[in-house]
Amino acid sequence: MLMSVQKENNVAGNAVSETHSGDSVYASLFEKINLNPVSALSALDIWQDPQAMSEASADERLTAGMQVFMECLAKAGAPVEKLDKALIDHHIAELDYQISRQLDAVLHHPEFQKVESLWRGVKSLVDKTDFRRNVKIELLDLSKDDLRQDFEDAPEIIQSGLYLQTYVAEYDTPGGEPIAALISAWEFDASAQDVALLKNISRVAASAHMPFIGSVGPAFFRKDTMEEVAAIKDIGNHFERAEYIKWNAFRETDDARYIGLVMPRVLGRLPYGPDTVPVRSFNYVEEVKGPDHHKYLWTNASFAFAANMVRSFVTNGWCVQIRGPQAGGAVQDLPIHLYDLGTGNQVKIPSEVMIPETREFEFANLGFIPLSYYKNRDYACFFSANSTQKPALYDTPDATANSRINARLPYIFLLSRIAHYLKIIQRENIGTTKDRRLLELELNNWIRGLV
């Protein structure tokens, strides 16, 4: 067998001990498993280098593993006469715990969470998309600062990169495929820079008839957490402060109807663990419980909204049914985490905060798209789909009602779809002898097939 801990304490740095001068347990063990014993021990620090790890042989790796195991036995402080399964499992569990805490530090780092949140949001959208039904998803690697710089460098909007990429290359090019919507993982605040960026995006979106979906976080409301946002007593008066002058002015513009801002974020995945998301390589238990709100992985709700848009398009041919629990606004199968603080299982809801129906109505009237979680259920719902535009008030009720309809995204998606089709009809019928009635009949037949 391997040397005892008593002998290990005497040699400290060595991980292998010879029982006889001519032959060693180490050599005998390697011979039985068809490996060659190494001539010299290496420092364990070199295994922190990925390149050294990849270049090492199986003999060196196993020897290093034996070194670590013998050091664990030495640190136990008690003699070990034999190695049984319980002892080995105990030390394996200790190693798993140490690796788990190191992995926690990586997974819970804000920068890593930002990357994982983005890709898990994209994956959730891709998983819910049937690409056989005339649906395409294209990814554009672009940060919010890069887009802001793009608009600042362009002398005018029509020379910006976003305009060239979306309007010129697709909507305005024969054979191009008009883009139905832009979905972003960006969170906007009410600063002058972000409002100016939203204004520029809205101009491009209106030109190409492609609504833009973004999101807002607690920073938009000048709060630190969404719980503080939900606790604002008079949300209407909150937006009458001087900090929101630019935002309120943007809401008065015509192109603001092409911008949708969702809130709050949703749970991207369950914490890793044998009962939630097991890891096969080792026993990883992620240390996350309900109060550790910042340790959970949250994803942007814009991807959930986009998934509902895709479902509506596949079912109806356009993105109209995207709000209401029975009309396409439900977000199903959200992860539910059960945790125990010593008083029994408790539930971590899959959204950052509970939004009551009254508060949801207030947020919607202020130009946001709230996602409301259904209590004691595994789903949430978009009850409204208002754009950021503030509906105008007119002297007649009909005019005011029309203004409200014009500010709703389902109506904008409908108009955008028709605008895309009209562009194609106009282009394809250049030079033909079709009169207005034939073109009108062709358009009506197309619309009739979608209703």
Which sequence ranges carry the predicted segments?
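Conserved structured core elements
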Residues: 60-63, 82, 89, 93-97, ...
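Long, charge-patterned amphipathic interaction tracts in eukaryotic proteins
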Residues: 117-190
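Extended, regular secondary-structure scaffolds
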Residues: 170-350
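Long, contiguous, structured domain-core segments that constitute the functional module of a protein
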Residues: 283-442, 447
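Short helix/loop capping segments that flank catalytic or ligand/cofactor-binding pockets
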Residues: 115-116, 148, 192-193, 223, ...
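Short, charged/polar micro-motifs that form catalytic or ligand-binding hotspots
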Residues: 78-81, 85, 89, 101-108, ...
